[in-house]
């Protein structure tokens, strides 16, 4: 059985999280290393599966390059999400490093990239405003425990029953949200006030700021997209994202272009990772934080598992839902100890990982190590990257996330209606509400179908 076939069989079986323990049989005084018994414990990470299948230097080169590409995107994005969430920028970096490493090392998806997510901005900001950073850390750790319990109850497998139209609509909605979040940097706009979170007010504010558009930023973003598309067309084996970022950064630095960079937007990058410590939870009420913890757990579980489903669709692989849920839970329990915020699998960075040619979870682990390395050694160089170039990359990622072929396959009005409702509720209301609306509508249509026929 080849690697893909084995992975599919393991994914559909009722697997548990498993570390593999090797027990040597010693039935005689002589030492015999040949007979081994493999004992499986629940929830095998995909990292273990990959190692069993064999891991070559060629695979490592693919993962190292993909991890570097994702890290280049994740570094400013993690800081920006943290700032928008009312947390210090280094909290986003710590989340990408610790949470990203744990999600990839322990997760049930080969390609999942963990870190801070834009979907959590409003929820995380409201928790920090009400309970402070200590309250967020406690709520995040509680959410992690809830995720692990959910995995033990096999709730992660429920994502397999989410209708395909809901997944396609949700993914398209996320793509629109991601693209909208990049318009500011794509056009080099200067906003008079902080950028609103909801789509309608965001687009209104961006339109009002349109006279401030920076032609140099627009040119850099357009050139970045053009370089990536050209390389993927004529030299598909070349690292298109990395080359585009290096060329854009070099041009902006050499020509002294008046565009925002990581350095001008975010200031200095932290140069060390804090020692893990338990923050003071004095005055924090577990009962008061429980609703927030449940919301974090539900949203994190849904986004992570749907992100894994998206990666499955892009690669033909199958993830292990409950193993992924355990990894997300462990990451959310441990990341706050390093000063991080809530962790989840992120569709944009996961899609970037796949598009960059990742082979397996080591790319996600490398992405975390690269972010740490940049934080320790390469802060001055990283500060030169134009935000317009990164916005161009994410705009292209958002475009590629929309499953256009899958949308065209939905020829019946029922699935199309489910897709449209999921998409619209996701972009105009809330991610969880979008998924819930799509599932409820799908169930309703399935319930009404036999009655219409009779």
Identify the function of each model-found stretch.
Residues 31-454:
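Transmembrane helical cores of multi-pass ion-transport proteins
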Residues 12-13, 19-20:
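Ala/Thr-enriched low-complexity intrinsically disordered regions
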Residues 20-22, 84:
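Juxtamembrane/membrane-water interface recognition
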């Amino acid at each position: 059985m080849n690697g893909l076939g084995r992975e599919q069989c393991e994914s559909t079986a009722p697997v548990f999280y498993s570390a593999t323990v090797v027990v040597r049989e010693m039935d005689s005084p002589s030492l015999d290393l040949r007979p081994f018994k493999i004992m499986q414990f629940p929830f095998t990470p995909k990292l273990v599966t990959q190692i069993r299948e064999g891991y070559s230097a060629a695979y490592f080169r693919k993962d190292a390059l993909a991890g570097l590409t994702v890290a280049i995107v994740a570094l400013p994005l993690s800081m920006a999400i943290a700032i928008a969430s009312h947390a210090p920028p280094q909290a986003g970096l710590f989340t990408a490093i610790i949470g990203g490493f744990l999600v990839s090392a322990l997760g049930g998806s080969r390609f999942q990239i963990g870190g801070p997510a834009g979907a959590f901005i409003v929820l995380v900001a409201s928790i920090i405003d009400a309970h402070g950073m200590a309250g967020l850390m406690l709520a995040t750790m509680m959410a992690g425990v809830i995720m692990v319990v959910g995995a033990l109850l096999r709730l992660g497998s429920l994502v397999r029953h989410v209708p395909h139209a809901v997944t396609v609509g949700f993914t398209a909605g996320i793509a629109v949200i991601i693209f909208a979040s990049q318009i500011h940097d794509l056009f080099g706009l200067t906003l008079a006030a902080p950028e609103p979170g909801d789509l309608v007010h965001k687009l209104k504010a961006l339109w009002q700021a349109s006279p401030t558009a920076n032609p140099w930023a627009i040119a850099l973003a357009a050139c970045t997209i053009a370089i990536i598309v050209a390389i993927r067309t004529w030299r598909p084996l070349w690292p298109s994202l990395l080359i585009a970022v290096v060329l854009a950064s070099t041009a902006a630095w050499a020509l002294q272009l008046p565009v925002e960079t990581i350095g001008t937007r975010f200031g200095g990058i932290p140069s060390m990772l804090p020692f893990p410590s338990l923050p003071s939870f004095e005055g924090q009420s577990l009962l008061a934080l429980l609703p927030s913890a449940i919301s974090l757990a539900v949203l994190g579980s849904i986004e992570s598992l749907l992100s894994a489903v998206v990666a499955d669709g892009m690669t033909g692989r199958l993830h292990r839902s409950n193993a992924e849920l355990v990894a997300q839970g462990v990451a959310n329990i441990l990341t706050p100890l390093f000063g991080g915020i809530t962790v989840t699998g992120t569709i944009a960075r996961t899609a970037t990982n796949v598009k960059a040619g990742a082979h397996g979870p080591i790319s996600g682990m490398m992405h975390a190590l690269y972010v740490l390395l940049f934080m320790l050694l390469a802060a001055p160089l990283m500060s030169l990257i134009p935000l317009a170039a990164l916005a161009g990359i994410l705009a292209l990622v958002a475009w590629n996330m929309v499953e256009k072929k899958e949308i065209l396959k939905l020829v019946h009005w029922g699935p199309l209606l489910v897709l449209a409702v999921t998409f619209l509720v996701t972009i105009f209301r809330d991610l969880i509400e979008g998924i819930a609306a799509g599932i409820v509508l799908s169930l309703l249509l399935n319930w009404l179908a036999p009655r219409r026929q009779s």
